[in-house]
């Protein structure tokens, strides 16, 4: 999946940047959507590239990173600024394991998955950041998927997990009602 995101990390920890158009596709999606956006990415290098590209086009005040390297004392301020409709902070770029739990980001009208993981709980929790009490607008969800790659397999696995959960829960509900 790192290759689909435009780089490969060697066993020694060196990054090799690869040609890819995922960042271009992200910028196209961002340009097509007005309003605030949450962008989830599972890789630090990807988060840094997203920040760099968004900052170049929209300015430093419009972008905030929220992942493991983000200082604890800065995290609450980032959320507060993102939730302020008058704040210039338009893009919340984060790792779903860091920002996907326990925070409210319902000013977002778009949620973009730059990369996904097989972790359904993390996916559902990160989706719920934009759907909280107080959300008044509809939210658009976008998965950036390179055709014929691991991206498709991951999203298919997530859908299968949701379908399985629905079947199990529905069966349990039916049994409980008897």
Regions found by a protein language model. Name each.
Residues 67-69, 115, 145:
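Residues at the C-termini of beta-strands that transition into short coil/loop
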Residues 118-178:
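A conserved SF2-helicase RecA2
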